[in-house]
């Protein structure tokens, strides 16, 4: 069962679901909570490696994964981020989310932004039960024009679904979970698989 706006408010008030900072009620509508773009970004460098072998996370051409991506860059609220057509950037949400063990979250982009070419997540849009931390967005500009992004702009919406019972292995208790208590923009950790 998906939570409606009234349910979301009740889960937040009971602190079963935690979103920090606590969302203003104007951001909770229908079945979603609007969330904002954070100020931490990671960009891909132009490089000479021809491809990444996803079976072993090696870049053909001798580079490592850390060499193809910038360190985390922190933008001020006034500082724009320019996302060129055909470019991918990793960035974090402004909000931090703590999920209970009996709730799954779903991240969706905003239709108005998608109509301009902005994809909010490449594939990872599920927020697992037991998740705790910022959400990293894999944003892609599929449009023809450069998109200007600014920290704290409304960027996406979260919806929540109640599970039939609490999960046996919540994300925060899994030994192999690669992104526990994520703060900021954590790059791919495929090499830890």
Swiss-Prot record:
Keywords: Hydrolase, Nucleotide metabolism, Nucleotide-binding. It comes from Buchnera aphidicola subsp. Acyrthosiphon pisum (strain APS) (Acyrthosiphon pisum symbiotic bacterium). Its EC number is 3.5.4.13. The lineage of its organism: Bacteria, Pseudomonadati, Pseudomonadota, Gammaproteobacteria, Enterobacterales. InterPro entries: dCTP_deaminase, dUTPase-like_sf, dUTPase_trimeric. Belongs to the dCTP deaminase family. DCTP binds at residues 110-115, 128, 136-138, 171, 178, 182. The active site is at residue 138. The keyword Hydrolase applies. This is dCTP deaminase. One of its GO terms (biological process) is nucleobase-containing small molecule interconversion. It catalyses: dCTP + H2O + H(+) = dUTP + NH4(+).
